């Protein structure tokens, strides 16, 4: 399992499938955002005064993230996206 540091967040991106004439085209389209599930969040970031500011998201949250944000990593067979919390646009409720 990945444990992010600082204000980084590990996401599992929800893949969209588009069907055209019975064929499935995975990842079709160039959306500006992606929907993802938060798998893990770091402890937060420290202010100049040394105070720890906890992340706004937690494991299990569904979030909207910029489509080109972060770094894709593999943990075993699973693919995850590691992003800075600032790249998360909203929590989907």
Curated annotation (Swiss-Prot):
Cited InterPro entries: Chaperonin_GroES (IPR020818), Chaperonin_GroES_sf (IPR037124), Chaprnonin_Cpn10_CS (IPR018369), GroES-like_sf (IPR011032)
GO molecular function, one term: protein-folding chaperone binding
Signal peptide: none
Keyword Coiled coil: no
Binding partners and assembly: Heptamer of 7 subunits arranged in a ring. Interacts with the chaperonin GroEL.
Similarity section: Belongs to the GroES chaperonin family.
Protein name: Co-chaperonin GroES
Native organism: Streptococcus anginosus
Taxon lineage: Bacteria, Bacillati, Bacillota, Bacilli, Lactobacillales
